């Protein structure tokens, strides 16, 4: 896409989040409770293991998003102090609301009436807001946010391509300079989802180059089941 449309560069960087000892213990304890509850119900035959595994993955990602909020807030505050316009994407409305309460800025989620969403984007594009916080489901498609030079992904959606689509709301014709994409990472849920995204990119590259290599890939529910069973 970048070569075809003569777009400026897009640079992606992974930012591991470091927790204090107390925060790390609290984070791991909450994850462990979710996993143990899944195992009990799965062993008792109370749930479909594949469907429940995805629900648990969502819960683990949501816990991770909560613990990444201070790091995300610090990063955004630093960028704003430098005069940068920033877009933040998250899968979770609660995380978006908490971040907006802490930093201000515009909020774009499914709880905003459809008729009002474009006006929020327009205010950001016009420079009336330096920060736009959005969920993937609302802001990740259809809008142009190319005023931002920085986009922060609190976590990534597991559907291949959705992270790229969200970044590309800012990576548009008419933007000035390199787009910096910041991926915050914390815990095994992020490792799994980001690994799937990297795997998808490798498959596309092989397809485009007509490579003959065969890549084994399990369905996501099975991968999550194995992760939870081996926890």
Where are the model-predicted features located?
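Conserved nucleotide-binding/hydrolysis micro-motifs of P-loop NTPases
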Residues: 20-23, 94-95, 113, 138-140, ...
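Conserved beta-strand segments of the P-loop GTPase G domain that flank and frequently precede/overlap
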Residues: 89, 134-135, 153-155, 184-185
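Alpha-helical elements of the RecA-like P-loop NTPase motor core of helicases
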Residues: 25, 70, 97, 118, ...
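A short beta-strand element within the Helicase C-terminal
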Residues: 143-156, 179-183
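Hydrophobic residues at beta-strand termini and immediately following loops
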Residues: 15-17, 108-110, 184
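Inter-lobe coupling linker of SF2 helicases/translocases
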Residues: 1-84
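A conserved SF2-helicase RecA2
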Residues: 158-231
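Conserved helicase ATPase core of P-loop NTP-dependent helicases/translocases
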Residues: 77, 85-89, 96-98, 104-140, ...
């Amino acid at each position: 896409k970048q070569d075809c449309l003569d777009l400026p560069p897009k640079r992606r960087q992974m930012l591991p989040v470091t927790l204090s000892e107390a925060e790390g213990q609290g984070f791991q304890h909450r994850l462990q409770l979710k996993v143990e509850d899944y195992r009990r119900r799965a062993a008792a035959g109370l749930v479909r293991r594949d469907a429940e595994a995805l629900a648990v993955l969502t819960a683990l990602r949501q816990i991770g998003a909560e613990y990444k909020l201070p790091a995300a807030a610090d990063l955004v505050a630093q960028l704003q102090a430098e005069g940068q316009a920033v877009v933040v994407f998250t899968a979770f409305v609660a995380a978006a609301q908490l971040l907006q309460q802490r930093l201000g800025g515009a909020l774009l989620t499914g709880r905003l009436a459809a008729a009002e969403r474009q006006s929020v984007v327009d205010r950001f594009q016009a420079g009336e807001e330096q920060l736009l916080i959005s969920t993937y489901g609302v802001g990740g498609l259809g809008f142009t946010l190319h005023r931002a030079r920085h986009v922060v992904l609190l976590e990534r959606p597991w559907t291949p391509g959705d992270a790229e689509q969200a970044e590309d709301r800012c990576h548009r014709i008419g933007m000035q300079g390199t787009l910096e994409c910041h991926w915050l990472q914390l815990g095994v849920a992020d490792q799994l989802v980001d690994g799937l995204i990297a795997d998808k990119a490798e498959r596309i590259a092989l397809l485009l180059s007509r490579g003959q290599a065969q890549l084994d890939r399990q369905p996501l529910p099975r991968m999550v089941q194995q992760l939870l069973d081996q926890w």
